């Protein structure tokens, strides 16, 4: 009796699957482990080796929504420009939706962004910005879209109204609708959409953090990865400030264990210091030895003091690449950066 029941069940399931495929097309439903099933998540490097390791899959996931937020001048746009530069190195097409109208092309070029290949839009309203994003994603020809920033996506009704008019919840409704529309086409087209967001303070919070991000709660739910980026100190050359010490915390991660954090240097005019990261991660992984203020790799002394060691690695590309490969191997990441050593030398 049980075998007859299971045969009937199987028959009913097969006819249901056949009906779904007839109605919605082949591939609209499939077995997770079968052929043409959902593949492993592809990742795109962030330009920071430490952050790639902290994210668990070697970078940010393709075909997902990512949110990067933090206080002013913390390095949000710098980090996304590095993501664009890394994607362009792999031959990807990238777009930058500049709702803040504040992108500096010369700075972007210094970080390695190919301006000739970068698509840029400076929309007038939030609806226009999200419509442009949706069209780019649906085209299937764009690999990465950056929206800078959610706070600057001003709803049309707010722009057309007077300065003092109250428009409670309009921004949140706009974002909520956009997330519902975007999420399916983002997954199908394998395009990553990065939203940069700002921080606001909640009034009257007694316990817990009073900080919140703009645009309501929808983006928090739909994001596969959320990164909190903060400036934690200044980097000085004698009395002159030449960069920021930066901490990034992976607040949410749907593709690997979350809550990891990483620290790196952002140098003014250069971006993320790759050589500084190699030293810090190399010491942690036991690839680089540090005794007192001296850094050494194998039998070779790299330099006395962090800045001297960074200069040595900039000048000796082969040693920098060897250290990077060993760090990647220690964390189980691919050796995909060894072919082009230029990016080590830049920072």
UniProtKB/Swiss-Prot annotation:
One of its GO terms (molecular function) is ATP-dependent DNA damage sensor activity. ATP binds at residues 70-77. CDD domains: RecA. PROSITE patterns: RECA_1, RECA_2, RECA_3. It is found in: Cytoplasm. It comes from the Bacteria. One of its GO terms (cellular component) is cytosol. Keywords: ATP-binding, Cytoplasm, DNA damage, DNA recombination, DNA repair, DNA-binding, Nucleotide-binding, SOS response. Gene3D superfamilies: P-loop containing nucleotide triphosphate hydrolases. Its main location: cytoplasm. GO terms for biological process: DNA recombination; DNA repair; SOS response. The keyword Nucleotide-binding applies. PANTHER family: MITOCHONDRIAL DNA REPAIR PROTEIN RECA HOMOLOG-RELATED, RECA. Belongs to the RecA family. Can catalyze the hydrolysis of ATP in the presence of single-stranded DNA, the ATP-dependent uptake of single-stranded DNA by duplex DNA, and the ATP-dependent hybridization of homologous single-stranded DNAs. It interacts with LexA causing its activation and leading to its autocatalytic cleavage. This is Protein RecA.
């Amino acid at each position: 009796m049980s075998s007859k029941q299971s045969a009937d069940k199987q028959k009913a399931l097969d006819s249901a699957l056949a009906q779904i495929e007839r109605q919605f097309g082949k591939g609209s439903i499939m077995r997770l482990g079968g052929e043409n099933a959902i593949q492993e998540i592809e990742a795109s490097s962030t330009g920071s080796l430490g952050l790639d390791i902290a994210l668990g899959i070697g970078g940010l996931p393709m075909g997902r929504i990512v949110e990067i937020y933090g206080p002013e001048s913390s390095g949000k746009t710098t980090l996304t420009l590095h993501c664009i530069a890394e994607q362009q190195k792999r031959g990807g097409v990238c777009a930058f939706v500049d709702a803040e109208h504040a992108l500096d092309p010369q700075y972007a070029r210094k970080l390695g962004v190919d301006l000739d290949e970068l698509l840029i839009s400076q929309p007038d309203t939030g609806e226009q910005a999200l419509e442009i994003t949706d069209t780019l994603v649906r085209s299937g020809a764009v690999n990465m879209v950056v929206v800078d920033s959610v706070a600057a996506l001003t709803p049309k009704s707010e722009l057309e109204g007077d300065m003092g008019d109250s428009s409670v919840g309009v921004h949140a409704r706009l974002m909520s609708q956009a997330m519902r529309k975007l999420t399916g086409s983002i997954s199908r087209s394998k395009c990553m959409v990065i939203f940069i967001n700002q921080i606001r303070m909640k009034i009257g919070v007694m316990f817990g953090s009073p900080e919140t991000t703009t645009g309501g709660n929808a983006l928090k739910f739909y994001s596969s990865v959320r990164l909190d980026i903060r400036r934690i100190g200044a980097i000085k050359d004698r009395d002159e400030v030449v960069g920021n010490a930066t901490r990034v915390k992976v607040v949410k991660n749907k593709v690997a264990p979350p809550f990891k954090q990483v620290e790196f240097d952002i140098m003014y005019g250069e971006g993320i210091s790759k050589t500084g990261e190699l030293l810090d991660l190399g010491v942690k992984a036991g690839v680089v030895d540090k005794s007192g203020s001296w850094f050494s790799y194998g039998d070779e002394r790299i330099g006395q003091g962090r800045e001297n060691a960074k200069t040595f690695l900039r000048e000796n590309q082969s040693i920098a690449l060897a250290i990077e490969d060993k760090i990647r191997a220690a964390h189980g990441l691919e050796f995909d950066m060894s072919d082009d050593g230029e990016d080590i030398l830049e920072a």
